[in-house]
Amino acid sequence: MARLAAFDMDGTLLMPDHQLGRETIATLSRLRERDITLTFATGRHVLEMRHILGTLSLDAYLITGNGTRIHSLEGDVLYRQDLDPQVADTVMHHAWDTGASMHVFNDNGWFTGQEIPALLQAHVYSGFRYQVIDIKSIPAHQVMKICFCGDHDSLIRLRIQLNETLEERAHLCFSAVDCLEVLPLGCNKGSALAVLSDHLGLSLADCMAFGDAMNDREMLGSVGQGLIMGNAMPQLIAALPHLSVIGHCGHQAVSHFLTHWLDNPHLPYSPE
């Protein structure tokens, strides 16, 4: 039986309205009662995740910023990695040929250059929000990640520009169809989970993980049991064809799967 369960948030543990369902919260509590370590592995900021954890009364490790930070149960930093300052400076100051909006994250929060109220819908549960600022004024040596938000086709074109300019100095991934992330080289949820599991005296084989987007690929592919959401990006399902696909986040499929796993561990699981 797995000893650690790692969960992506958006599109996985959270429902489409960006909230946790009652069944999901109850199932997470059951996991803790079985002494299974909980880990939330997300692109969201630790400041936001601490607020969410506080409303749940659950002990969980946090992998935030898509693997750029790991925090202990007590809130201590176990691991941190920032973008190479030259990479951050280039991305923030270059005139990219795109209509996508740029978002910069550091330990102080989420920063963008203009008001985009629609993006706050994903954060109604926590109240976390961006700060509007001149992005070029942000110190390049304190940036954990940079995101671009826009339609998928424009982000694909932007990814080509970023790859040509940055070459092999950063890790690019889609955390959603409308969000392209620029991360430190070698930084992802999978590598962060490897650091955390080693810290806990576990192996990745002792872990299970759930996810729906390409920023979950390394994590899902490296654990003992990786589960893909039924609402996942098609690219993720194609990249990991050997993994099981469960139900939709809107149906609290993670809770559905885990309830079966806890109650009938030796019986095959049938998705909703």
UniProtKB/Swiss-Prot annotation:
Active site: D8
Keyword set includes Isomerase: no
Catalytic activity, reaction form: 4-amino-2-methyl-5-(diphosphooxymethyl)pyrimidine + H2O = 4-amino-2-methyl-5-(phosphooxymethyl)pyrimidine + phosphate + H(+)
Cofactors (names): Mg(2+)
Residues that hold Mg(2+) according to the record: D8, D10, D212
EC number: 3.6.1.-
Family per similarity comment: Belongs to the HAD-like hydrolase superfamily. Cof family.
Listed HAMAP family: HMP_PP_phosphat
Name of this chain's protein: HMP-PP phosphatase
Biological classification of the source: Bacteria, Pseudomonadati, Pseudomonadota, Gammaproteobacteria, Enterobacterales
